[in-house]
């Protein structure tokens, strides 16, 4: 059996410059907020995702797709560039309490062998981390996910995202990110996708300290995501996180959110989003070169 390795989803530099287009109901809300005709049809999301994959994947080391809206279509249309690896989201988002993702389980519809035949090299699992929910349940889910990936020769990418506790109103996001890393940072996955400390805001020195603290608890390669980070601050966030030990990014919003709902989507992706992704890739290479 062919077992993929981390090198299969990195750039030649060894760094990760990966594009996410697996947002689901959150993306529908983004279209609505941008003034799109509501209710926003599934086809609007599918078209955007497939176009983004076609236009942006040549600049990414990997692209993350979701089964619900775009994976099948992307495969059928050969949307992903040959030079770009494919990652498939294996998480089932359960809405509730007025938010699009209130709970997450492993998607039972995922067929690891079939996605591998289609060319996927990794699966990704979102793990919601709340201080007052059972840690063992999270660890068990990650273990099951790792087994699903590794028994099929696929890479395992976990994405712990912190949320306020179910009960009570005290929430220290920064401490929660660290606590989640303490719990899941040595859980046997191949890659850890993490929220940027301090939303990438403030003094560089503070960001570096926070990122170094995070690095101390993650015993696998790690990358940052861009949700919650101002897209103008994201390139710096990538630099600082990598200075602290990260190996790149797996991000969507910082690359394409500014073109959501604009006319001439393909043109906007080409002229606005592609240069952003290209520059981020250069930053990753630059930071990796400093490690030699």
Curated annotation (Swiss-Prot):
<dbReference type="InterPro" id="IPR050552">
    <property type="entry name" value="LacD_aldolase"/>
</dbReference>
<comment type="similarity">
    <text>Belongs to the aldolase LacD family.</text>
</comment>
<dbReference type="InterPro" id="IPR002915">
    <property type="entry name" value="DeoC/FbaB/LacD_aldolase"/>
</dbReference>
<comment type="subunit">
    <text>Homotetramer.</text>
</comment>
<keyword id="KW-0704">Schiff base</keyword>
<keyword id="KW-0119">Carbohydrate metabolism</keyword>
<dbReference type="InterPro" id="IPR017291">
    <property type="entry name" value="SFP_aldolase_YihT"/>
</dbReference>
<keyword id="KW-0456">Lyase</keyword>
<protein>
    <recommendedName>
        <fullName>Sulfofructosephosphate aldolase</fullName>
        <ecNumber>4.1.2.57</ecNumber>
    </recommendedName>
</protein>
<dbReference type="Pfam" id="PF01791">
    <property type="entry name" value="DeoC"/>
</dbReference>
<dbReference type="InterPro" id="IPR013785">
    <property type="entry name" value="Aldolase_TIM"/>
</dbReference>
<dbReference type="GO" id="GO:0061595">
    <property type="term" value="F:6-deoxy-6-sulfofructose-1-phosphate aldolase activity"/>
</dbReference>
<dbReference type="GO" id="GO:1902777">
    <property type="term" value="P:6-sulfoquinovose(1-) catabolic process"/>
</dbReference>
<comment type="function">
    <text>Cleaves 6-deoxy-6-sulfo-D-fructose 1-phosphate (SFP) to form dihydroxyacetone phosphate (DHAP) and 3-sulfolactaldehyde (SLA).</text>
</comment>
<feature type="active site" description="Schiff-base intermediate with substrate">
    <location>
        <position position="193"/>
    </location>
</feature>
């Amino acid at each position: 059996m062919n077992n993929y390795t981390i090198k299969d989803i990195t750039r030649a530099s060894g760094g990760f410059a990966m594009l996410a287009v697996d947002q689901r109901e959150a993306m529908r809300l983004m279209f609505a907020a941008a003034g799109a005709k509501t209710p926003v049809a599934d086809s609007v999301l599918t078209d955007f995702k497939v176009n983004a994959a076609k236009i942006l994947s040549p600049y990414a080391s990997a692209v993350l797709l979701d089964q619900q809206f775009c994976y099948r279509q992307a495969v059928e249309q050969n949307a992903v560039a040959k030079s770009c690896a494919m990652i498939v989201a294996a998480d089932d988002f359960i809405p509730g309490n007025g938010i699009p993702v209130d709970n997450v389980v492993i998607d039972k519809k995922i067929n690891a062998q079939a996605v591998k035949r289609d060319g996927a090299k990794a699966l990704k699992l979102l793990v919601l981390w709340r201080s007052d929910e059972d840690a063992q349940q999270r660890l068990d889910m990650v273990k099951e996910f790792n087994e699903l990936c590794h028994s099929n020769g696929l890479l395992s990418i976990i994405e712990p995202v912190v949320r306020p506790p179910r009960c009570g109103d005290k929430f220290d996001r920064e401490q929660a990110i660290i606590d989640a890393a303490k719990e899941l940072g040595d859980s046997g996955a191949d890659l850890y996708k993490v929220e940027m400390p301090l939303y990438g805001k403030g003094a560089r020195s503070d960001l570096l300290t926070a990122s170094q603290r995070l690095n101390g608890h993650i015993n696998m390669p790690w990358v940052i995501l861009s949700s919650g980070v101002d897209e103008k601050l994201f390139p710096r966030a990538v630099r600082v996180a990598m200075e602290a030990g990260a190996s790149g990014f797996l991000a969507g919003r910082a690359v394409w959110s500014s073109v959501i709902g604009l006319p001439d989507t393909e043109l906007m992706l080409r002229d606005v989003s592609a240069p952003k992704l290209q520059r981020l890739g250069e930053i990753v290479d630059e930071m990796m070169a400093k490690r030699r």
